Amino acid sequence: TIILFSRGAALNDLRTILVMATQLMSKALHLCVPIRIGVAVGTFFFNLDESMYAGPALIEAYHLGESAQWIGIVTSEAVYRRAIEAELQSGSSDVVIPAEIPVDGGSRSGYVVNWPVILRNSIAAPLPVTGQQVYEGFAQYFGPFESLDQRTRQKYEHTAAFMNTSAA
């Protein structure tokens, strides 16, 4: 688990956290590390000397990231509202957007970082892509796509669907 946090809650702090989360996502994808990220804003306590972290924002971010069944960055509604308030955009697209987020047993409405648009110049394959194409780089570490269990294959298929929809 990697915890990114700011000492403040200003819009510039939010911008910094979203930039860092997106850069982390980009680096992880380039290194073929499938990650899920959750971003929340709110009460958060930390003690750097003891490496202790706690608070509702940490728990919310954890649940947002871990419940998503894809490679992506899920945010809280408060993060979405603040990103809109700050007019955070990549080109003409909002950085945080409403989306259907795949979860166990279906999907739920929520908010996500529009990383396929932000990282559009880093995505090697032309869109649209399939789940198998998203997975290609990971195969060297995790084996052939066909050997993955259904639930794991679906994560890559959900990721491809989001990439195709958001960057269209």
Task: Specify the residue positions occupied by each region the protein language model found.
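Catalytic core of nucleotidyl cyclases, primarily class III adenylyl/guanylyl cyclases
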Residues: T1-T16, S26-P56
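Generic detector of bulky aromatic hydrophobic side chains
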Residues: I2-I3, A9, D13, Q23, ...
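Alpha-helical structural motif
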Residues: M20, A57-E60, V134, K155
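Catalytic/regulatory signature loops of cyclic-dinucleotide turnover enzymes
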Residues: L29-C32, R36-I37, L58-V79
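Amphipathic alpha-helical "stem/stalk" segments
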Residues: Y53-G55, E60, A83-I84
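Intrinsically disordered, glycine/charged-rich C-terminal tails and inter-domain linkers
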Residues: W70-A168
